[in-house]
Amino acid sequence: MSPDRFPGWPHWLPIAAQRPRMSPDWWPWVASRDSLTARLRIASPRPFSVRLLTQGVTRPRLDEAQALGLPHRTHVWHREVLLRLGNASWVAARSVAPLEGLSGARLCTLGERSLGSWLFRQPNLERGPIEAIRAPAMTGLDAWRGDAGPWGRRSLLRVGRTRILVQEFFLAAMAADLSLPSR
């Protein structure tokens, strides 16, 4: 089934397809292939922190299962966090990974540390294509829905046998603090 048939499902597009809709100010944030954590730390003098919202085993959303090549009813590890600068939440992130291949990955022990702080230290890290979404409030992450900014992005990252779908949603506070436009 295609997400087009169900308007409540997220509709992710390749990053290049979203570029005409995106302000040049947002492009470096949404299209960057390096560590978002590192970029956030550079962008603000305020202290960086991670607020863990939830972590555990669940079933993926249909679009997540499709991106990971899994049956929809499969159980996955998931983690939702807010990336904060000072007291402001700049990014909401949701990561999903198949349970097989997780042993030794240390994902469950990250706690209040960013996933990027582990991922981007791995010498065998591979990042797949980046996809973007214009209306990230449709993704079902209720903890920050009222603070949604204009863009979200996701990509599949691999470290050995571990596959992780990382989804990052830029929030209104980030746009306001960096004087970024609404698109």
From Swiss-Prot:
EC category: lyase
InterPro entries xrefs: Chorismate--pyruvate_lyase, Chorismate_lyase_/UTRA_dom_sf
A Pfam family: Chor_lyase
Binding annotation for substrate: 79, 115, 168
Signal peptide coordinates: none
One cellular-component annotation, GO: cytosol
Subcellular location: Cytoplasm
General function of this protein: Removes the pyruvyl group from chorismate, with concomitant aromatization of the ring, to provide 4-hydroxybenzoate (4HB) for the ubiquinone pathway.
UniProt protein name: Probable chorismate pyruvate-lyase
Biological source species: Chromohalobacter salexigens (strain ATCC BAA-138 / DSM 3043 / CIP 106854 / NCIMB 13768 / 1H11)
Organism lineage: Bacteria, Pseudomonadati, Pseudomonadota, Gammaproteobacteria, Oceanospirillales
